[in-house]
A protein has these predicted regions:
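Secretory/organelle targeting and membrane-embedding segments
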Residues: 1-11, 15-271, 275, 279
């Protein structure tokens, strides 16, 4: 009999309910498994366009020199979905949007967008750069949360022609629940590359459409030469569409196809490929 098998442990959230319980769970696991046998995963990192973030950054000479606070005004990360909590009301009551989406999926995308170039594509080297970003996140005081974050909960409504229940009417959800199903807020990274650049995150259920998207908004040009046309120049945008239609678009200003000199925003679009939406 062949006894030279191997063992692997694959874990995804929820990994504990807070730092203390997560550390306790991690210690228990490491008593039974070697570190190289443990795979703590985030399924968002399996999405093609999430993986494409590092390729766009580090395989294209045009982006990396601009990828800093000298040229970028802000970065927006959105993950919205049409679905409600479905049959996960009991789980969602203990997590809410913050634990369900922000502390894992959203922060993983922020880390990929903000990290320094790793010394190699080895998973440990990439992880090391992500950790530096997470350590640079400014800690939020209660007054910061009140000023820079918004939480909400979906109510009854009509989506795609169908009436839908409110969150409090879902199975295994308390009638007076205050669990947020929507979170939007501003994160700040205190390092030389990103000082002063806000990272806006937003995620929610029962939204108008399913969208996972990154928008990089660049700063204005030093001077608007077209001020005599009463035209405010639109910001240059790099838009990374992760789902449902995977692709990259670059929004620039160009001359209108009319006599005289006036500008209009144009969009350079590249569809990487189109796939069916997945959870």
């Amino acid at each position: 009999t062949n006894t030279s098998g191997f063992k692997r442990l694959v874990i995804e959230k929820p990994f504990g309910s807070d730092l203390k319980s997560a550390e306790s769970l991690n210690n228990q696991i490491r008593r039974s498994f070697k570190e190289e046998e443990i795979y703590r995963i985030d399924h968002y990192l399996g999405k093609d366009m999430v993986q494409n973030i590092e390729v766009l950054r580090f395989a294209n000479a045009m982006f990396e020199p601009l990828w800093n606070n000298k040229y970028i005004s802000n970065i927006q990360v959105t993950s919205s979905e049409v679905l409600g909590v479905e049959d996960r009301g009991g789980y969602y009551e203990s997590s809410g949007a913050l634990k369900d989406m922000v502390q894992n999926h959203m922060l993983q995308m922020v880390a990929l967008l903000a990290m320094e170039a790793p010394i190699s594509l080895n998973s440990e080297d990439i992880r090391a750069e992500k950790v530096k970003v997470l350590k640079s996140l400014r800690q939020l005081r209660p007054q910061d949360v009140r000023k820079n974050f918004v939480r909400g909960q979906y109510d009854r409504g009509v989506i795609e022609g169908q009436e839908v229940k409110s969150y409090r009417e879902e199975d295994r959800v308390a009638e007076d629940s205050i669990t947020p199903t929507f979170v939007s807020g501003k994160l700040t990274i205190d390092n030389f590359r990103w000082a002063g650049v806000p990272f806006y995150i937003r995620t929610g259920k029962r939204m108008k459409s399913k969208t996972i998207q990154v928008v990089v908004e660049f700063k204005e040009v030093p001077m608007n030469l077209y001020y005599q046309t009463d035209k405010l120049l639109d910001s240059n945008l790099l838009v990374i569409n992760i789902q449902p239609n995977e692709g990259v678009s670059l929004h620039l200003n160009a001359k209108k196809n009319i006599q005289g000199i006036d500008t209009e925003p144009v969009q350079l679009l590249s569809l990487i490929h189109i796939s069916e939406p997945t959870r």
